[in-house]
Amino acid sequence: VRWCRLLAAHGIAADPERLELGPPGIGVVAPERRNATILHPGAASPARRWPADRWVAVARSEAERGRPVLVTAGPGEEGLAAAVVRAAGVAGGSGGTVNPAGPTDLLHLAALVAAAERVVCGDTGVAHLATAFGTPSVVLFGPTSPDRWGPPPGRTIHRALWAGREGDPHGAEPDPGLLRIGVDVVVDALAALPARGATAGRRPEALR
């Protein structure tokens, strides 16, 4: 809002409710990476990181429903993403798979989010990418209220989960409020998201 006010003061129209971005145009998104459920287990501080075993449970739940799952990582989070993938494995006979997204810079990560069917993440930049590209999302908040950094209110394609208590966003352990969010709550929130085809939002055509 402050940036919009600054622009308005110089005669430049800016609507704080319009947060959409066009998709990044950087190559082709491989077919097997489109329409996936993206899980992004990392976050800047331990206080905002949901436990890895819960990410594993969500990955398995999605795979059991026949959905492809991509586990993404930011710099320094590759080990966490790999551990989630190894523990989740492949749901036999369901057609669902759990795979690492592989090395991704910011533009590649943005393209994957723009091409995804849905996103699950913590209070991180990936949540803002999902908002910008109109990708349905479930965002897990711990020490910080979604009123500060969450998706815009009133948009049914985004679900912000929060236990209702604030804490230390820089804490060295997962926030107690974040730990109150159970796997079943996240799975139910995913099930309640509208299909991507029913929402507005452009997808990138390319990324390899």
Predicted regions and their residues:
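Catalytic machinery of carbohydrate-active enzymes
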Residues: 1-208
